Regions:
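Rossmann-like S-adenosyl-L-methionine
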Residues: 1-3, 9, 13, 218-431
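Short, acidic/hydrophobic/Gly-rich beta-strand patch recurrent on exposed beta strands
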Residues: 13-19, 141-144, 208-210, 349
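Short, conserved phosphate/pyrophosphate- and ester-handling motifs at nucleotide-, phospho-/glycolipid
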Residues: 35, 159, 292
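Extended interfacial segments that mediate partner engagement and assembly in macromolecular machines
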Residues: 55-67, 73-181, 201, 216
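Terminal RNA-binding accessory module
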Residues: 1-67, 71, 370
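Short, aliphatic-rich beta-strand segments
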Residues: 196, 203-212, 279-284, 384
Length: 431
């Protein structure tokens, strides 16, 4: 038996074995909440810890609720759904605090409570689902935790309904045309992933088929049928990924029907004090865009509030994507420079600036660490640096370059408390 004492950043229960030869061993158990006493079985055993699955909950901790989705306990997408949302927010705040203390060694910083999302179901504007065979039929869903076993999930409740509809039609087309599914063990087959994205502010959608090659039969007919059957579908794209890799996308996109982007209207209604503003954004299939548009308004509003931008400020936006933060910052500052490694996203960013009539902003393509010295030679030194790196955090070279600039303030937007705390420690040690 295991008593669950806390949660880790994945939402897994962290507990200890209560008796027997492994008494006291730390165990990570998905699908549990603090206070649970569970009968479990090991799926992985190391010297100092183990991973386990639940056989039976013997005592329920506070905050346990029924899962809204029937496959939430099987797929790897919703590791917190068995928990009351208020309890989730409390523990997520604690996880950030723990990262500050354990990794960044910061103990005198006040951590604000988590801001709740306006929507907790039906919010996700993009989904990338692997495909596989099950009993001879093609299925699409999500990977079972710590495996590449696909759990079919056609009615995922966190997805925006329009996203769910696009995936359903894409899957129907793959089945109808009998496209072969890619097998990552043998390297054979064609279709790897189905991808859908919707712009909640306009309802425009894109459908992407990720394949090992571009010579699939009937692509034009498939695209025509999708465009006819899905309301507001603006793009059908084939992405080619012929590498032996776990990366979802390759670097080649083929537009089969429609236009190469969708447009979203994003932000709050007014541009007054304390309000984010409202802008229009073009989004290419592979460009980064916050998957919870509703919560992203809160995120960007908070980030820009903490930046305390002044009318004469120069801002560098590092990892700028399609220019979302850059353009909202440009409404408040004198000049903004965005740096982004993904070239299609940079092209989107320039178009977005033009579409919104914003002229006090520019963008540079390239790795941030290499680009920043060139920016300093071409533009004024920034008063504020805003950075929104991927889950793995920022590169040390990028952090060093930013530290050397010594801006008035750095606003770091993160989706991973552990790598954020690691990077904060680096910046703190650099002064």
């Amino acid at each position: 038996m295991v008593r669950i004492e806390s949660l880790n950043h994945r939402g897994e229960g962290v507990g200890r074995v209560l008796s027997g030869p492994y008494e006291g061993l730390t165990v990570f158990v998905p699908g549990t909440v603090p206070g649970d006493v569970a009968q479990t079985f090991f799926v992985e055993k190391k010297k100092t810890f183990a991973r386990a699955q639940v056989k039976r909950i013997l005592e329920q901790g506070e905050g346990r609720v029924g899962e809204a989705c029937p496959v939430a306990s099987k797929c790897g997408g919703c590791s917190w759904q068995h928990m009351d949302y208020g309890v989730q927010l409390e523990w997520k705040t604690k996880i950030v605090e723990e990262a500050f203390h354990r990794i960044a060694r910061v103990f005198d910083c006040e951590i604000s409570p988590c801001v709740p999302s306006p929507k907790i179901l039906g919010y996700r504007n993009k989904v990338e689902v692997p495909v596989a065979y099950e009993n001879g039929q093609v299925v699409a869903g999500f990977y079972e935790p710590y495996t590449h076993n696909v759990v079919p999930a056609q009615d995922c409740l966190v997805e925006h309904p329009a996203v769910r509809n696009v995936i359903k039609h894409l899957l129907d087309q793959v089945r109808k045309r009998r496209y072969k599914v890619y097998n990552e063990k043998t390297g054979r087959g064609a279709v790897r992933h189905l991808v859908a994205r919707v712009a909640p502010g306009t309802d425009e959608a894109v459908a992407v088929l990720v394949s090992t090659g571009h010579r699939l039969s009937g692509l034009n007919d498939m695209a025509s049928e999708l465009m006819e059957s899905i309301p507001n579908l603006r793009s059908v794209v084939l992405n080619v990924n012929d590498e032996a890799t776990n990366m979802i996308f390759g670097d080649r996109d083929y537009l089969i029907a429609g236009r190469p982007y969708i447009q979203d209207v994003f932000g709050s209604e007014t541009k007054g004090s304390g309000s984010l503003g409202r802008l229009r954004f073009r989004i290419s299939p592979r460009s980064f865009y916050q998957v919870n548009s509703y919560q992203a308004v809160n995120l960007y509003t908070t980030a820009l509030s903490w930046a305390e931008l002044k009318p004469n400020d120069v801002v560098y936006d590092v990892y700028s994507g399609i220019g979302t933060i850059s353009l909202f910052a440009a409404l408040r500052a004198s000049f903004v420079v965005g740096v982004e490694e993904v070239e299609p996203a940079v092209k989107d960013a320039f178009r977005n600036a033009r579409d919104n009539g914003i002229e006090n902003v520019t963008f540079k393509a390239g790795k941030a660490a290499r680009a920043i010295p060139g920016l300093l030679a071409e533009y004024p030194r920034p008063d504020v640096v805003i950075m929104d790196p991927p889950r793995g955090g920022a590169e040390k070279e990028t952090l060093a370059a930013i530290a050397d600039i010594k801006p008035r303030s750095i606003v770091y937007v993160s989706c991973n408390p552990s790598t954020f705390a690691r990077d904060m420690l680096f910046l703190k040690e650099r002064g």
